[in-house]
Structure formats: structure tokens, C-alpha cells
């Protein structure tokens, strides 16, 4: 008997995991910071990839989360049947990579690169935090399904 977890059905939890991983990858390339001085003085927003090396770490973690979510989804759809321990390990990998990515993004949200007094936060940071939370919740939902 399949239990419904945090996100309802296992397929829904898998879809949230995949969407969160993809959004986390995309967030790295969206603007993270915008200059406060105006367009004539400062060019448009800077993506996380351009702004900080932390974003490159987030990118790697996002790829790990996305691959884990895709393999879990293949297991849920019975395309690639996994052993219970393997599926649980992948779910924990999704949770851990999402949490660490969220912490890294949160750090850059709280402490932008210098000179920070001329920067405002942009959409990429906020999308990244939301995607990291979504990935962690999706991983936890997969773990709850397996109990």
C-alpha cells in the first residue's frame, strides 16, 4: 500500500523535485543583484554565475538535486526500479543538496558581494531559495513514502 506523504502522491512529489531542481539550475543564471545607482551608471542586473563563486557551487548542487529527482521519478514510474536503500539514499541526497544550496544562497542573500551598499537583491536569489525549499520538501516526501 502506497502512503501519501507531504505532497500527496509519489508522482507529485517527484514532479516537485524535478521542477525544484530545474528552477535551482535556472536561478543561478538569473539576475541576483541589481545596481541601485540607475541605468546610466551601472549596467543591468548581474546573474549569480557572474557575481559570485558561491553560485557555481549552487549550480553543482542543483545538478545533483536534479539528477537525484529524475532517478527517483523514474523509480516512481517503474521505469528504473531501485532497491529501497538506493531510493532512500537518493531522496536524502536530494534533501541534503537542496538544503546546502539554500544555505549558500541564503548567505549571499544576507551578505552580497562588495560594495554591497550599491546593490539590491534580484529575482534569482529569491527563486533559488524557493527552489531549494521545494527540493528539500520533495525529498522528505519521498522519504515519508518509503516508510
Residue ranges: model-predicted function:
Residues 1-147:
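Compact integral membrane and secretory-pathway proteins
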Amino acid at each position: 500500500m502506497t502512503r501519501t506523504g507531504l505532497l500527496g502522491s509519489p508522482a507529485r512529489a517527484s514532479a516537485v523535485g524535478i521542477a525544484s531542481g530545474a528552477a535551482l539550475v535556472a536561478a543561478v543564471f538569473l539576475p541576483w543583484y541589481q545596481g541601485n545607482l540607475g541605468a546610466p551608471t551601472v549596467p543591468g542586473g548581474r546573474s549569480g554565475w557572474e557575481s559570485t563563486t558561491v553560485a557555481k557551487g549552487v549550480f553543482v548542487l542543483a545538478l545533483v538535486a536534479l539528477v537525484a529527482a529524475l532517478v527517483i521519478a523514474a523509480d516512481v514510474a517503474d521505469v528504473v526500479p531501485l532497491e529501497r536503500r538506493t531510493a532512500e539514499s537518493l531522496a536524502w541526497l536530494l534533501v541534503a543538496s537542496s538544503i546546502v544550496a539554500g544555505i549558500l544562497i541564503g548567505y549571499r542573500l544576507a551578505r552580497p558581494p562588495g560594495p554591497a551598499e550599491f546593490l539590491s537583491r534580484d529575482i534569482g536569489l529569491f527563486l533559488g531559495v524557493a527552489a531549494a525549499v521545494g527540493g528539500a520538501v520533495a525529498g522528505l516526501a519521498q522519504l515519508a513514502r518509503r516508510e
